[in-house]
A protein has these predicted regions:
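Short beta-strand scaffold segments in enzyme catalytic cores
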Residues: 92-93, 97-104, 396-400, 470-472, ...
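Internal maturation/activation junctions in enzymes
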Residues: 207, 213, 313-414, 423-427, ...
Length: 583
C-alpha cells in the first residue's frame, strides 16, 4: 500500500498545485464554436507507461498521478471520475450515472459496469404526461420528477473493488476530489462560458445558486474560485463508509428530501435499493479487429456494431476520407441502425431485444442491400413509425490505458448541463434529469430528438435507454483504441467515425478525433454537420437527397491509440480544457 508520509505529502502538494496554480490557458476570444484545425497541425501526446485523456485538465492530471504512483487503469478511472464531479460540474458527477468498459490484461477479460440511474419505485408509464394525456417535457427535463436514482458512487466503488490494483483504497482515490472540493479551484473558461446559459435553471434553488453564483447573484466568471464544502463532506462520507455513505444515512436522507421537496418521487428506500450491474460486453468484429462496447441499457454498443457491420461490406479505404461517396455510406448506415434502436431497444431487465439478430453480419448484409450509392433513402421508407427520445448531450467521457495493458473507457452524465439544476441542500450533489431519456409516450421524442417505442417507456426500477458508447478496440486480445464521447444521440456516430478514421483511413488518432463529423439518427430525417466540410462536398450530398443542417452539436471523443512504440493520447480539441496526460 502506498501510504508513506512522504507519498502523502507529495500527493497533497500536487493537488494544491492543481487547485491554486493552474489557470485557464485558452484565450477568451477563441472560445466560441469549433473550427477543425488543419490535419497536419494536430498532434497526439505520446507516453510509454500510461495515459489518461479526459475532458477537464485537473481531473486528467489526477488520473495520471495515480498511474504514476503505480495504480492501474481502473484506479485512475475511479480517481478521475470522482474528481470530475468537482471540477467539471456540468457533466462529471456523483448525482448521475454512466457506463464503464474495462479490458483487464491481468485476467484476459473484458467486462462492463452498468451504473445507469434507475427510476424510483413510484414511477409509472404515465409520469411524464400532462392532463391532456400528451407528453409534458417540462416534467422530465425541468422538474424533480426527472431525477433518477444516482449510480455513479456505487459504480465506481464496484469497479475499484473488483478490478482495481489493490494498491489504493477508495479513500485514497477520493482524496484528490475532496481536496479540490474543499480548497476550491480556479473557474475555467469552459465553466464560465456555460454558467450564464444555465444559471437561471440553477438559481431556481438557493442551494444551487449559492455554489455557482457570486455574492451579487450573477454567475461565477473565469478566475473566480469555486469552493464546494458540502460536496467535500459528502465525498468524505463515501471515503469513510464506502457507498453506504451515499446511499444510506444522512446523505441519502438529504438527497431524498431535496427531491421530494422539489416535487419529485425519489425516496431513501430507492437510494438504498440501488445496485450497479456487471454485464458482459456486446462484441463484434470489424476489418479483423474486435469491438468491445456497452450492452443494453445503453444502445451504444448495439447500434455501433450494427452500423460497422453495414459499412464492412463497402471498401471505404478505396474512397477518400470525407468524400461525398464515403459520407453518403456513413449516413445511410447510421440511418438504418438508429431506426432499429428506436424500435427494439430498452432496459434488458424489462425488454427482450433481438440483440443477436441486430449485430449479425447477415442482417447487416440485408440492410446494406437497400443502400443506393447515388440516392439518399428517405427515413419514412425504412420504418413506418415515429422517432426516439432526445438525450442530453452534456455527458463526459474519459479513456485510460496503463503500462500493463489494462484499459478503461468510461462515459457518465447528468443528462442536461448541470442536470436538473438542483443541488441537494447540505450535500453539494448536483442531481440528474436522466429520466427524460425514457420515452414519455410511444412515438414521442426526448430532448435530443430521438423517438422511442414501448421498450423504453418509464417504469419502477427501470433504467432508461442511453446512447453512451464507451468502446475498446482490440487486436489479438490487446487494446488498440480506447474511445467514447459525450453528445447524447450523437455519441454513437462520433465513436463510429473515430473508429472508421483510424481503422479504414489509417489516420493519426489526433487527426481522427479532430476531423469534422456528421450525424444522422433516422428521425428527424436530416444530416447534422460540423463546420469544416467543403462546400462542394455538402452540395454533392444535397444532390443525393440529403437534408444538410448545421450545427451538429457538441461531442468530445477523448481517445487513446496503443501502438508498438507506445501510447498516443488525443484530447478532443472541441472541448476547451480537455487534456491528454501521459507518463
Amino acid at each position: 500500500m502506498m501510504s508513506s508520509y512522504s507519498t502523502r505529502r507529495t500527493f497533497f502538494a500536487f493537488i494544491a498545485t492543481l487547485a491554486f496554480s493552474l489557470a485557464p490557458a485558452t484565450a477568451q476570444d477563441a472560445r466560441r464554436g469549433y473550427v477543425p484545425p488543419a490535419r497536419d497541425t494536430v498532434r497526439a501526446v505520446a507516453a510509454d507507461h500510461g495515459m489518461m485523456v479526459a475532458q477537464e485538465r485537473f481531473s486528467a492530471q489526477v488520473g495520471a498521478d495515480i498511474l504514476r504512483r503505480g495504480g492501474n487503469a481502473v484506479d485512475a478511472a475511479v480517481a478521475t471520475g470522482f474528481a470530475m464531479a468537482v471540477t467539471y460540474p456540468r457533466a462529471g458527477n456523483i448525482g448521475g450515472g454512466g457506463f464503464m468498459v474495462i479490458h483487464s490484461a491481468d485476467r484476459n477479460e473484458d467486462i462492463t459496469i452498468d451504473y445507469r440511474e434507475t427510476a424510483p419505485a413510484a414511477t409509472t408509464p404515465q409520469i411524464f404526461l400532462g392532463a391532456d394525456g400528451k407528453p409534458d417535457a417540462t416534467k422530465s427535463r425541468d422538474s424533480a420528477l426527472g431525477v433518477g436514482v444516482p449510480g455513479t458512487v456505487a459504480g465506481l466503488a464496484l469497479a475499484l473493488d473488483k478490478y482495481g490494483s489493490g494498491q489504493f483504497t477508495l479513500a485514497q482515490l477520493l482524496a484528490p476530489a475532496i481536496a479540490l472540493a474543499r480548497d476550491g479551484f480556479i473557474v475555467s473558461d469552459d465553466i464560465a462560458d456555460t454558467l450564464p446559459s444555465w444559471h437561471r435553471r440553477l438559481a431556481r434553488w438557493p442551494s444551487s445558486a449559492k455554489i455557482f453564483s457570486r455574492p451579487d447573484g450573477t454567475p461565477l466568471v473565469e478566475g473566480d474560485r469555486l469552493v464546494q464544502g458540502d460536496l467535500a463532506e459528502t465525498l468524505s462520507a463515501v471515503a469513510a463508509l464506502g457507498p453506504r455513505g451515499f446511499y444510506e444515512g444522512e446523505v441519502a436522507e438529504k438527497l431524498a428530501k431535496a427531491v421530494t421537496d422539489a416535487g419529485g418521487i425519489m425516496t431513501p428506500a430507492d437510494l438504498k435499493a440501488y445496485r450497479p450491474v456487471i454485464r458482459a460486453p456486446v462484441r463484434g468484429t470489424y476489418r479483423g479487429y474486435d469491438i468491445v462496447s456497452m450492452p443494453l441499457p445503453s444502445s451504444g454498443g448495439v447500434v455501433l456494431l450494427e452500423t460497422l457491420n453495414i459499412l464492412e461490406g463497402f471498401q471505404l479505404a478505396d474512397l477518400k476520407q470525407g468524400s461525398p461517396a464515403s459520407l453518403h455510406l456513413l449516413i445511410e448506415a447510421m440511418k438504418r441502425a438508429y431506426a432499429d434502436r428506436a424500435r427494439y431497444l430498452g432496459d434488458p431487465a424489462f425488454v427482450n431485444a433481438p440483440i443477436e439478430t441486430l449485430i449479425a453480419k447477415d442482417y447487416a448484409a440485408k440492410l446494406r442491400a437497400g443502400i443506393s450509392a447515388e440516392r439518399a433513402t428517405p427515413s419514412k421508407e425504412l420504418v413506418s413509425a415515429s422517432a426516439a427520445p432526445r438525450e442530453g448531450s452534456n455527458t463526459t467521457h474519459f479513456s485510460v490505458v496503463d503500462g500493463r495493458g489494462n484499459a478503461v473507457s468510461n462515459t457518465y452524465t447528468l443528462n442536461f448541463s448541470y442536470g436538473v439544476g438542483l443541488v441537494a441542500d447540505g450535500t453539494g450533489v448536483l442531481l440528474n434529469n436522466e429520466l427524460d431519456d425514457f420515452t414519455a409516450a410511444v412515438g414521442a421524442s426526448n430532448a435530443y430528438g430521438l423517438v422511442g417505442f414501448e421498450a423504453n417507456l418509464p417504469g419502477p426500477g427501470k433504467r432508461p435507454l442511453s446512447s453512451m458508447s464507451p468502446t475498446i478496440v482490440l487486436k489479438d486480445g490487446k487494446p488498440v483504441l480506447v474511445t467514447g464521447s459525450p453528445g447524447g444521440s450523437r455519441i454513437i456516430s462520433t465513436v463510429l467515425q473515430v473508429i472508421v478514421n483510424v481503422l479504414d483511413y489509417k489516420m493519426d488518432v489526433a487527426a481522427a478525433v479532430a476531423t469534422p463529423r456528421l450525424h444522422h439518427q433516422w428521425l428527424p430525417d436530416e444530416v447534422r454537420v460540423e463546420r469544416g466540410f467543403p462546400d462542394d462536398v455538402l452540395l454533392a450530398l444535397k444532390a443525393m437527397g440529403h437534408l444538410i443542417v448545421e450545427p451538429m452539436g457538441q461531442t468530445s471523443a477523448n481517445s487513446i491509440l496503443v501502438t508498438p512504440s507506445g501510447l498516443l493520447g488525443a484530447a478532443d480539441p472541441r472541448t476547451r480544457g480537455a487534456e491528454a496526460a501521459g507518463q
